[in-house]
Amino acid sequence: MQVQAAPFGQPGWLTMLDRVPESPIPMLGVAQFYARDIPEIPFPEGTDLLQVLWCPNEHDLEDTGLAPAPLLVWRRVTDVADVLAEPPMRDHTTPDGGTETPVADLSHEDYLPRPCVLHLERVTEYPDPEELPGHVQTALNAWEDSSEHSYQYLLSIAPGCKIGGWESWHVTDMYELPCDVCGTETEPLLKLASSEWDGGSESRWRPLEERHLEWGTPECEETLEPTTLQLGRHAALTIFLCPRSAEHGYRLTIQ
C-alpha cells in the first residue's frame, strides 16, 4: 500500500522539506486486530482481520488538520499466506533511480510506532460529560463538589489506546461526525494515544502491576508510552466508523 507523501509547508517544519520525497513511500503498519479476539469490531461480511496502516508523514486532513493519513484494510485471515521476509520498499528509491534511503529516515519520527504486543482487557467507561443530559451534568457537578472526586478521571473516558468506547471532548467542544456516505453519526472504532494515562487519570487507570515503577525511570516511560507515538500536542487520534457499514470510510478526531 502506498500514499503520495505531502510536502511540509508549515512553520517549524521547513528544515525537513528536503527529506520528504516526491515519489510514493510505503504505508506503515500501525495495528491489526482479529475478529476472534475482538468480535465487537464491526467487520464487514466475509472479513475477520483489520489492518490499520498510515503514511508516517504530516497530511493536511479535513477532519484534523496535520496528522498521519490512515488506511483501514479489511481482510480474511485465510487469504493471508506466508509472511514476507523483507517488507516492501524498506528503502526508498526515487523514480529516476536515485540513492536508496531508509524509509524511516523520510518519516515523521512521532508517527513511527514502537512494536509492542497487545494485552487485551475489557473495561467499562461512561460518556464524556458533554454527551450527558443537562440534569445528569448538574447532578454530577454537585457530586464532585461534595465528594472532591472527578467524574472525568474516575468514571468517564479510559485514557490510552483502545477499541470502541466513548470519545473525550476535553480539547474541543463536542461536535457531530456524520458519515460522508449516508449521514449516519459515526462511532469510535480505535483510539491511538500518545500515553496510556496521566497525572489525573493515574489513580484510576494505571495498571496495578505497574504502580511500583517510579516516574521518570525508563521502565515507567516504557509503560506510560509503550508505542512512543506523539499525536497532536501529546493527544490522541480516534478513528470513527459508520455503524451502518464499515466500508463507508472513516472520520477522525484529535483530542
Regions found by a protein language model. Give the residues of each.
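Preference for intrinsically disordered or flexible, low-complexity segments
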Residues: 1-255
